[in-house]
């Protein structure tokens, strides 16, 4: 340890500067940056960070161990992502997603659609505690409905993500909703109640914006006729209401606190079983085998791991009826691993901590302290590329500062959620941004400007802090009582 030196600010920033330059070049030169360009950029930036680490006296073994550790921490997300790919495949061939689109077109008014998409996504996400499951299931169906009535897919994706991350932030079943108060040192329900002060006005503004967009949207240019969509779906699938048993079972097991991996596996297999029962024509279209048992096995496997594209008389509808299974998620898995390598190297040499030191010194007033926390969460979401790191590290960094200023821990936990949780999906190379972009098939840069809830949240929490609205402080003589969290 004695031979190791602390990095200068320039040394700590150098890998990030290299990363920003490479990512900018990729956007200019490559159409599909997720196809490999951004992954290589992250690895090259990690190589630069490794050179800095060696210059500071760190050995390769310590850097390697940190890389392995950070990749290991991302494995649950990677496994969930792969299962979501399989679930999307079996839910397509079973007719679950087409049925959602079919019946949704009858129930949802075009002008109220975006408003409804936010509300529905929020309700499902609060009930399940998972933005990922919400977006991969009801979100995919809502995107199909939105495209069918002629709304730009980026706007629809923004509405879905806004609602889903409301639930991710507010649901007592959500992992981030439990993680933030644990890092800050408060209890879960105090944390949730305190979040309502900033979350409710943020959600209200989000709904108003989407309501205005919906009523100002020009539907005369819609490229898909709703009746044509319904007719094409009806001609390809058996759209029985019984198909809704699949999502009902999935959401039920999630609400019962069955872990995400077995929950998604149950949903995937159930989708395959319903495909065999309800969609024999689809099964035979995919496999071409004479024996139905063989055809069923082939179709289920193909939907779970590979490309499936079903054709209808309407070419526009065909865009809604395709999936890539697990294989479609591999570029995103590659991106997540690359991001974890970069984050691991940066953390191993203390480069991330060095960059945030000036931010901590800047935090004098309550407003500046909250703004510094927000900025740090954004920084870690961008550089470490992981939502959990963006909550855990700032939570540990700033916890003592909040105590010293007499601020109750729920202010810190709320700030971690208002910035760390919701902004992760706005970063293309963050695990959340990369995943939701791949699941919805919409580029992160395209939907980010319309994810109003995620954009407004950090500004709302800073506004409350600077205006001293609902800022909880310890009374004179009151001692902090916080939950100790092991490192």
Question: Where are each of the predicted segments found?
Answer:
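Alpha-helical transmembrane segments in multi-pass membrane proteins
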Residues: 19, 41, 45, 49, ...
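Hydrophobic transmembrane alpha-helices that form the pore/transport pathway of multi-pass ion
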Residues: 107-197, 201, 374-418, 483-485
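Juxtamembrane membrane-interface segments at transmembrane alpha-helix termini
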Residues: 52-59, 146-153, 170-174, 274-285, ...
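Membrane-embedded alpha-helical segments and adjacent helix-loop junctions characteristic
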Residues: 57-147, 306-399
């Amino acid at each position: 340890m004695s031979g190791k030196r602390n990095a200068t600010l320039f040394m700590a920033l150098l890998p990030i500067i290299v990363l920003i330059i490479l990512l900018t070049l990729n956007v200019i030169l490559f159409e599909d940056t997720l196809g490999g360009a951004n992954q290589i950029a992250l690895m090259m930036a990690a190589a630069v960070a490794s050179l800095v680490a060696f210059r500071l006296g760190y050995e390769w073994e310590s850097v390697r161990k940190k890389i392995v550790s950070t990749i290991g921490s991302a494995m649950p997300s990677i496994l969930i992502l792969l299962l979501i790919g399989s679930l999307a495949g079996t839910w397509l061939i079973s007719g679950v997603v087409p049925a959602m689109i079919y019946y949704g077109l009858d129930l949802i008014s075009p002008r109220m659609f975006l408003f409804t998409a936010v509300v529905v996504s929020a309700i499902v996400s609060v009930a399940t505690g998972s933005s990922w499951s919400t977006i991969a299931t009801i979100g995919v169906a809502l995107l199909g409905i939105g495209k069918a009535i002629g709304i730009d897919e980026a706007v629809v994706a923004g509405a879905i993500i806004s609602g889903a991350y409301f639930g991710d932030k507010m649901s007592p079943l959500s992992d981030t909703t439990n993680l933030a108060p644990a890092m800050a040192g408060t209890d879960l329900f105090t944390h949730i109640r305190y979040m309502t002060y900033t979350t409710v006005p943020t959600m209200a503004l989000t709904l108003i914006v989407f309501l205005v967009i919906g009523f100002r949207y020009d539907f005369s240019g819609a490229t898909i006729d709703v009746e044509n969509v319904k007719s094409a779906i009806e001609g390809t699938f058996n759209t029985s209401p019984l198909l809704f048993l699949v999502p009902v079972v999935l959401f039920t097991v999630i609400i019962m606190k069955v872990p995400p991996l077995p929950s998604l596996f149950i949903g995937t297999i159930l989708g395959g079983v319903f495909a065999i029962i309800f969609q024999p024509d689809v099964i035979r279209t995919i496999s071409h085998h004479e024996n139905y048992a063989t055809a069923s096995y082939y179709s289920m496997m193909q939907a779970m791991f590979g490309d499936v594209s079903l054709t209808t008389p309407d070419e526009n509808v065909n865009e809604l009826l395709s999936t890539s299974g697990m294989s479609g998620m591999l570029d995103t898995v590659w991106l997540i691993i690359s991001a974890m390598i970069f984050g691991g190297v940066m953390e191993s040499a203390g480069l991330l901590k060095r960059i945030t030191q000036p931010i901590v010194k800047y935090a004098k007033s309550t407003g500046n302290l909250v703004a510094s926390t927000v900025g740090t969460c954004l920084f870690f979401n961008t550089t470490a590329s992981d939502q959990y790191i963006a909550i855990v590290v700032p939570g540990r960094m700033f916890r003592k500062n909040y105590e010293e200023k007499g601020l109750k821990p729920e202010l810190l936990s709320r700030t971690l959620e208002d910035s760390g949780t919701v902004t992760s999906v706005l970063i293309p190379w963050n695990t959340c941004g990369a995943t939701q972009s791949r699941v919805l098939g919409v580029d992160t840069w395209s939907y980010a400007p319309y994810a109003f809830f995620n954009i407004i949240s950090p500004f709302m929490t800073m506004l409350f802090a600077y205006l001293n609205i609902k800022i909880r402080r310890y009374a004179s003589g009151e001692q902090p009582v916080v939950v100790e969290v092991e490192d």
